[in-house]
A protein has these predicted regions:
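N-terminal "domain-start" segment that seeds a small globular fold
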Residues: 4-40
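Thiol-/selenol-based redox modules, centered on thioredoxin-like
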Residues: 7-19, 124-174
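Short pre-active-site segment immediately N-terminal to redox-active cysteine/selenocysteine motifs
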Residues: 46-48, 53-56, 86, 118
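Conserved redox-active cysteine motifs that mediate thiol-disulfide chemistry
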Residues: 52-69
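Short, internal strand/loop/helix patches
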Residues: 80, 94-128
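Acidic helix N-cap motif at the loop->helix transition within catalytic regions
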Residues: 89-92
Length: 174
């Protein structure tokens, strides 16, 4: 973590789920470990999973294989992982436990925004950029529920795309 940066003070309960559910994902600008700049515009048009984790978090590491399986199952979703750890720290961990999400290292923007103090936390965002689900902790029930919701979000994307094509065709033929 960069010197002078601190996580917000408070218990895990400070996560403001109710404040964010159903709201647009806010504007942001962050760099991933490959130096790509990400903004809100990059997440519009396809669902997104944002996972909060850190290298010393056992539950975070235990859920990584399940999160990786989501990537295989739903390839048309954007997968971001954010941590306050450095890129070098992330690299050491993902060599032991692969975690294929796009990594945003040494960054507290999302932590402060959502008031995250306990991890893991996962946020699901729909293709319009609306926050549909936020959950802290891990476990089989959470991962199963979130996987089902992600399946619906991914199907919603395909279904609406097909409807958009149909309505455009109908307008052209009218």
């Amino acid at each position: 973590m960069k010197e002078g940066r601190k996580l917000p003070v408070g218990a895990v309960k400070s996560l403001e789920k109710e404040k964010w559910l159903g709201q647009p994902f806010p504007e942001f600008k962050v760099n991933d470990t490959q130096e790509r700049v990400w903004t809100r515009a990059d997440i519009i048009g396809r669902p997104m999973v944002l996972n909060f984790w850190y290298t010393g978090c056992g539950p975070c590491r235990r859920e990584m294989p399940d999160l990786n399986r989501w990537m295989e199952r739903f390839p048309n979703v954007t997968y971001l992982a954010t941590t306050f750890d450095s890129a070098a720290q992330i690299q050491r961990i993902v060599e032991e436990t692969p975690f294929r999400f796009i990594q945003i290292a040494d960054e507290l923007f999302f932590f402060n925004l959502f008031k995250v103090t306990g991890m893991p936390v996962t946020v699901l965002v729909d293709k319009k950029g609306m926050i549909r689900y936020i959950e802290e902790g891990t476990g089989a029930a959470k991962l199963r529920y979130m996987g089902d919701l992600l399946a619906r979000l991914a199907a919603e994307r395909r279904k609406r795309s097909a409807l958009d094509i149909t309505s455009k065709t109908e307008r052209l033929c009218s």
